[in-house]
From Swiss-Prot:
Keywords: ATP-binding, Kinase, Nucleotide-binding, Transferase. Gene3D superfamilies: Glutamine synthetase/guanido kinase, catalytic domain. Belongs to the ATP:guanido phosphotransferase family. This is Protein-arginine kinase. It comes from Listeria innocua serovar 6a (strain ATCC BAA-680 / CLIP 11262).
Amino acid sequence: MNVFEPRLSSWLENAGDDDDVVLSSRIRLARNLKDEQFPIYDQKEEVVDNIAEVFDDNFTLIKMNQISKLQKALLVEKHLISPYMMNKSEYGAVLLNEEENVSIMLNEEDHLRIQCMTPGLRLFDALEAALQIDGYVEEKLTYAFDKQFGYLTSCVTNIGTGMRASVMVHLPGLVTTKRIKSVIEAIRSLGFVVRGIYGEGSMPASSIFQVSNQVTLGKTETEIVEDLTQVMEQIIMQERVARTTLKQKFHIALEDRVFRSYGLLMNCRIISMQEASDAISDIRLGVELGFFEHISRQKMNELVLFSQPAFLRKEAGRDMDELEEKVIRAKVIREILGDK
């Protein structure tokens, strides 16, 4: 297993339900060990070793103090660790399976953060996988649990189930038709949170949004997933309607925009992250509307991931200034799009 190589995790490589709109689903369970101080206050490396002993050879342990800054950044870009773990977790670690659809962060804000990712809208599959791992760990270690409040966590907003269910969606139709603001307001009024592609602290960009639950206390895991799934089904429907409207009423203008973006990425020699992200979003929309039969969703995911700064530094084999990064990004994008 070499997680630092430029390859897609299984949840970005494989097909999933409603994946014309939904990029991925994720379930994250926050857990702490009984009689151990929460890692946000006091990190202990032996806690990592004790937890890691529970898992078999199907998981690879990666300790943060044994890898480079570049390798940490690669893990963040692949959504396998959080920006918090990259920047603040001295004695943190992550357990990964071969498919990279299970990521168990150790000594992040909590002792364990069990993440299971699936392609498309498959929250229940992710929940089943996460609860299976959680049950296995709970048979061998004692969690910090209160009969009244549920699982105890470093952040009070996670107390209860300790669960965050989230869905990453691409909503260019709603953005272009200027309906996204009202949709986000409706989502928030139902008790859900809308963030950017890297979750907490990140802003939505290039029509990619992450929608997650806010309430963890007073509802079961199944109820939370059912509620979020229902919300996402409504969002998916509205996004498809918006795309159909754009194609029917503004076909030439939309086609021009999409093919201009394609021409830009096929021929550019210097390109910024933001410009590339916006163009990739346009092309992804074009793929879903049938403008590009030779471009797969998998290739679109490659464009998104491998044009990120850390992957570009790995491609170049060195640190780069801003101009060099833009040049390498343009080269990588041309190579991916040109590989039919």
